A protein has these predicted regions:
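Acidic-enriched and Gly/Ser
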Residues: 1-202
């Protein structure tokens, strides 16, 4: 079973990541289907597209766009699946909706996506805990590598370009290569900002 242009994937776990384990208790974090931040982004690849060359293989773990597994309310107020739904627990995902795939225990980006971790705000008078639009590149891609922008570099990115993901207990911002505006180089005195709630959740 293969799609011509899309991946066929199944979610790892539930469609929504609404709970977090606190000791022996499952804490419910969200009860609304509208909140995209709690949609599960992790999937297993069931099949790869026939007409698109991709490094992703059947069985790989991938990170997806938040709308693949999401549910919506239609005009009549009824819950419906996203247009990505195929059947049972299977979904279509276009190449543009697959951001990362895991290979040899490491995450590799697909196409022009990259992931940046925000840095701590050291200004004692500031109310924000992280510096706006500045972060450390954690997962790069081939486009950025050609520009000599590599993981570990401190970068400035466009305001509003960041989409929040939780990858391996780290809160990262997903964006495109052209959202990276400036490379500062590696800065040893800059500390990553990863809130405690990001650990142990997706």
């Amino acid at each position: 079973m293969k799609s011509v242009y899309d991946f066929i994937v199944r979610p790892i776990g539930e469609r929504y990541a609404n709970t977090k384990k606190i000791g022996d208790t499952d804490l419910v974090l969200n009860t609304k289907i509208e909140n995209w931040k709690f949609v599960n982004r992790f999937a297993e690849v069931v099949s790869t597209p026939l007409a698109v060359a991709t490094p992703v293989r059947t069985g790989d773990i991938v990170v997806l766009h938040q709308n693949v597994f999401r549910r919506f309310y239609n005009m009549k107020g009824k819950q419906v699946n996203s247009r990505s739904y195929f059947k049972d627990d299977l979904y279509f995902a276009s190449v543009e909706q697959v951001y990362l795939y895991k290979r040899n225990k490491y995450w590799e980006s697909l196409n022009d996506r990259c992931f940046v971790m925000p840095i701590k705000n050291t200004d004692t008078l500031a109310t924000q805990k992280e510096v706006s639009n500045v972060g450390i590149l954690k997962i790069g891609n081939s486009f950025l590598k050609e520009l000599e922008i590599t993981p570990g570099d401190l970068v400035t990115f466009k305001a509003g370009s960041e989409w929040e993901f939780n990858i391996d207990d780290e809160r990262l911002y997903c964006m495109k290569s052209n959202d990276i505006l400036l490379k500062h180089g590696y800065k040893e005195n800059q500390a990553e900002y990863n809130p405690r709630w990001a650990k142990g959740s997706r």
